[in-house]
Swiss-Prot record:
UniProt biased composition (Polar residues): 478-495
Record InterPro entries: FAM65_N (IPR031780), RIPOR3 (IPR026136)
Family named by the database record: Belongs to the RIPOR family.
Protein name: RIPOR family member 3
List of residues that carry Phosphoserine: 9, 24, 340, 351, 384
Domain of life: Eukaryota
Keyword Metal-binding: no
Gene this protein is translated from: RIPOR3
Compositionally biased residues, Basic and acidic residues: 437-446, 496-508
Transmembrane feature ranges: none
Length: 946
């Protein structure tokens, strides 16, 4: 069932259009067909690279909802994994035996090169066997802990069922509550162990082998294959050619296996402007944990008229481990590596012609280093700068012309070449596989338009960066973590003063962004992916994460002597300590000094260092708004959240996404030199009254944020002449209330006070002004002071007179503050009968004020989840008068409260909502009755606990 396949490189898909449709219903146009024929002959290294999926361990994340553990599924995957690991270990042991036997039979030649390389390969396999044995022991330990927790959970569940059949008593209820907590803890432990076990499942490399059909596959047909494994997806498109061959846009994809997800495959036939679903099938991943690559044929249709051929290859370790350790199932098989090693001839000393060619290649590099200009791309860049460049700079220079190889023979002859370097230039980027896969991932899942700003491509050489934030991610919105998007790095080599300033910034105490970024992403993953606000926020945060760099990561410059020394010592292969992958890639002829170890992947570097944007102002802004996003997402994950509160939270999430999008297009070199906010954000000039206040809080170089205490003092200084005389003693309180509203997103988030280290950004302040529709800040502050005074009056004598004024124009002037709504609601319980009637009547009359009602509903719905029983009771009564049917589910849930007063208020409010309220109350009453019946069943059962 062989199928002739052609795969298009990512660079060719733009011209080919992958499987694009023409304007007519005829499918491909003739021009597109001609472009396909031209692009087939191109061979891109990147198309041969596996597109590595982003790691999405579905259970090992904070803030996600703990699902019910599935021990049988975990047992099945564990047994398959253990079987595959043992098989893998046997293969490694057989390889070691073969190398040991060959080591004994090898005679030492004059150069000793082959003998030493064979010895290195033997030690490498031994290290890999030890690593595999540790891997197996770790998996066994995790599963043993999982089984213990499973038995504890089963025992607690049995005891809970037994106690449920006991006569109802206080002791039985307490025991049931304790058992419920134990059950929850055991389930959480099992869930965490499942997440830890998923990390050890390795990777599946799935390669497309083509569609097989009989009468169904016709020339010109377009097909789309979609594969899903949990949250990971791979969509590829193909076309049936006239010679019965098939053209597909991708060849291989790496998936991270999970414990509870299987591989779903869906095939769709593209017809003109429509599509027809051919079939869908699900494959059990437990069958994929085998050492050797296996070709599977999947029946897409029920009758088997169309089959899909796939090659599945399992790697017990991830790609990063694969790059630094041997693996028989890697991109280069063990057989090919043995062939390249055993048939290898020790290289001779470089000839005069080769040394001359090296010196010619080195001259422009030396000049570029001395002059500080951009360097020409050559293979020497990979040899000399592999540990000096950032990963993004390496990825920019991966596409090398074939003439840059300084091999004097055919580069394809990698096994018998005796030149200075026997490795093909096209294979060099394979050493940097993770970065290439990240770029392919960015191409595979492009961001929707408008989420991230359009990045202008860099002009000139790969190092000729323009200052500013807009050009720092020039190639793609999703770049590797080494992408330097701070403005000082590119220009620091040309201006000593700027270099010193940048160095001072980076060496000083900064803001750590790695933790907040990961926390926000972990909170975003378990959320509802159908919400566009959350999806767009995730894309925006991912864009920032991929462009952050490790702290103090600077470009180092080497002299001409060190560059020459690096080149000459690349032939010191006898002293090199190479991993097997690098040895096979370079043919054993390239080496590094022992004191110049191979640089680790960028992902390992980034993980061991804190990430920074390179500009202190940007770090502060990102930190503040990431903390706001974290608080919003935590509240979104709360149980029994009302739809009203959820919509308000999603609106604020969209606002934070807009702020991050604005930050991504700012020129932060300009920010560092700005003296006023209008220079950075011209739209800020529309709020002239607020700008004067903000200018008093900021200074040159830091115009987008200020400490909360500074803004507090500036507010006092600005408004003291209007407030002190008319409202004595209210200035401090009014200023603090305003800042609390700014920080808590208008009362949406719980207030955490105003510590001195709290930072307030311009975007938070401007968002507050927009939310309150402030055109005159002085007038707004006066109304806020009146409301603060009103709160005090509601706690003093003469409350009835004050409450009666809460109507009409006076009601419309209120924000209202959370303190106002709280005091108003509590008057229904704590006041005199006359005051209670007045407070209830004014709340009922406030229904006509739409703005007030929305804010009041939001506050009182949040109050239902508080631990204050008096506030819960008052909130229920307030929702009754406001006709808050939007919160009917939250109100009905309080009908099961332990306190009679809260239950009565919740029952009264729920039944006041008409037919919907009656149905909700009956539903809750039915649940209560079922629970009571469970307690009363089999009352004669006696339980003895030792």
């Amino acid at each position: 069932m062989s199928v002739r396949l052609r795969f298009l490189s990512p660079g060719d898909t733009g011209a080919v259009g992958v499987v694009g449709r023409s304007a007519s219903f005829a499918g491909f146009s003739s021009a597109q067909s001609r472009r396909i024929a031209k692009s087939i002959n191109r061979n891109s290294v990147r198309s041969r690279m596996p597109a590595k999926s982003s790691k999405m361990y579905g259970t090992l994340r904070k803030g996600s909802v703990c699902a019910d553990p599935k021990p049988q599924q975990v047992k099945k995957i564990f047994e398959a994994l253990k079987r595959g690991l043992k098989e893998y270990l046997c293969v490694q042991q057989a390889e070691l035996d073969h190398l040991s036997g060959r080591h004994k039979d090898t005679r030492r030649n004059s150069r000793l090169a082959f003998y030493y390389d064979l010895d290195k390969q033997t030690r490498c396999v031994e290290r890999h066997i030890r690593k595999m044995e540790f891997h197996i022991s770790k998996v066994d330990e995790l599963y043993e802990d999982y089984c213990i927790q499973c038995r504890l959970r089963d025992g607690a569940s049995s005891m809970q069922r037994a106690f449920a059949r006991c006569p109802p008593s206080r002791a039985a209820r307490e025991s049931l509550q304790e058992l419920g907590r134990s059950l929850h803890e055991c389930a959480e432990d099992m869930w965490l162990i499942e997440g830890a076990l998923e990390v050890h499942l390795g990777e599946f490399h799935i390669r497309m082998k083509g569609l097989v059909g009989y009468a169904r596959l016709c020339p010109g047909d377009h097909y789309e294959v979609l594969m899903r494994l949990g949250r990971q997806r791979w969509k590829l498109k193909g076309r049936i050619e006239s010679d019965d061959s098939q053209t597909w846009d991708e060849e291989e994809k790496a998936f991270i296996p999970t414990l509870h997800e299987n591989l779903d495959i869906k095939v769709t036939e593209l017809r003109g402007l429509g599509s027809l679903a051919v079939g869908a099938v699900t494959c059990d991943i437990a069958d994929f944990f085998t050492t050797r690559p296996q070709v599977i044929v999947v029946d897409i249709t029920e009758l088997g008229t169309i089959k899909l051929q796939l090659e599945v290859q399992w790697n017990p370790f991830d790609t990063e481990s694969f790059l630094v350790s041997p693996s028989p199932t890697g991109k280069f098989s063990m057989g090919s590596r043995k062939g390249s090693l055993y048939n290898w001839t020790p290289p001779s000393t470089p000839s005069f012609r080769e040394r001359y060619y090296l010196s010619v290649l080195q001259q422009p590099t030396q000049q570029a280093l001395l002059l500080g200009g951009p360097r020409a791309t050559s293979i020497l860049s990979y040899l000399s700068d592999s540990d000096l460049r950032g990963p993004s700079l390496r990825s920019q220079s991966q596409e090398l012309p074939e003439m840059d190889s300084f091999s004097s023979e055919d580069p394809r002859d990698t096994e018998t070449s005796t030149s200075a370097s026997t490795s093909d230039v096209g294979f060099l980027p394979l050493t940097f596989g993770p970065h290439a896969s990240i770029e392919e991932e960015a191409r595979e899942d492009p961001l929707p338009p408008g989420l991230l700003p359009e990045m202008a491509h860099l002009s000139g050489g790969p190092f000729a960066e323009q200052p500013g934030w807009r050009n720092l991610g020039g190639e793609s919105p999703s770049l590797p973590q080494g992408s330097l998007f701070h403005s000082g790095t590119a220009s620091s080599s040309q201006n000593g003063h700027e270099e010193g300033a940048t160095g001072d910034r980076e060496d000083g105490p900064g803001v750590a962004l790695e933790g907040p970024l990961q926390e926000v992403l972990e909170l975003l993953r378990p959320t509802d992916s159908t919400q566009p606000q959350l999806r767009e926020l995730e894309y925006q945060v991912l864009g920032f994460r991929d462009r952050l760099k490790p702290c103090r990561a600077r470009q180092e410059h080497t002299s001409a002597e060190s560059l020459m020394e690096c080149i000459l010592e690349s032939f010191a292969f006898l002293n090199a300590d190479f991993a097997l992958d690098e040895l096979s890639l370079f043919g054993g002829s390239q080496g590094l000094r022992k004191d110049r170890p191979l640089p680790p992947p960028s992902s390992l570097k980034a993980s061991s260092r804190e990430l920074t944007a390179g500009a202190p102002e940007l770090d502060v802004l990102l930190m503040v708004h990431l903390q706001v996003c974290k608080a919003l997402l935590q509240k979104l994950a709360s149980p029994n959240l009302s739809r009203l509160v959820q919509e308000c939270l999603l609106e604020e999430v969209a606002q934070q996404k807009h702020v991050l999008e604005t930050l991504s297009v700012l020129d932060f070199e300009k920010v560092g030199k700005a003296t006023s906010i209008e220079e950075i954000i011209p739209q800020a000039s529309r709020t002239k009254g607020c700008l004067k206040l903000w200018r008093g809080c900021t200074g040159p170089g830091r115009v987008l944020s200020c400490p909360a205490t500074t803004l507090l003092n500036q507010l006092k200084k600005t408004f003291q002449h209007r407030v002190r005389g008319k409202y004595p003693g209210q200035l401090e309180i009014a200023c603090r209330r305003l800042l609390e509203q700014v920080v808590s997103c208008g009362g949406l988030l719980p207030g955490a006070g105003l510590p001195e280290e709290q930072i307030i950004t311009w975007f938070q302040f401007h968002s507050y002004l927009q939310r309150q529709s402030v055109s005159d800040l002085e007038k707004h502050f006066t109304q806020l002071t009146k409301e603060v005074t009103l709160i005090e009056e509601l706690h003093c004598a003469g409350q009835a007179k004050v409450v009666r004024k809460l109507q009409g124009k006076r009601l419309g002037q209120l924000q209202p503050l959370p303190q106002t709504l709280r005091a108003w609601a509590l008057l229904q319980l704590d006041g005199t009968p006359r005051v209670c009637r007045a407070a209830s009547a004014r709340l009922a009359g406030a229904v006509r004020n739409r703005s007030f009602r929305e804010k009041a509903l939001l506050f009182y719905t949040n109050a239902l989840a508080e631990n204050d029983a008096r506030l819960q009771q008052a909130a229920c009564l307030a929702l009754k008068h406001l006709k808050g049917i939007e919160s009917i589910d939250q109100t009905a849930s309080l009908c099961q409260s332990d306190l009679e007063a809260v239950r009565a208020a919740a029952r009264e409010t729920t039944l006041s909502f008409g037919e919907k309220g009656r149905l909700a109350f009956e539903k809750m009453d039915k649940l209560c009755s079922e629970q009571r019946e469970v307690f009363c069943q089999e009352a004669d059962v006696e339980i003895t606990i030792f």
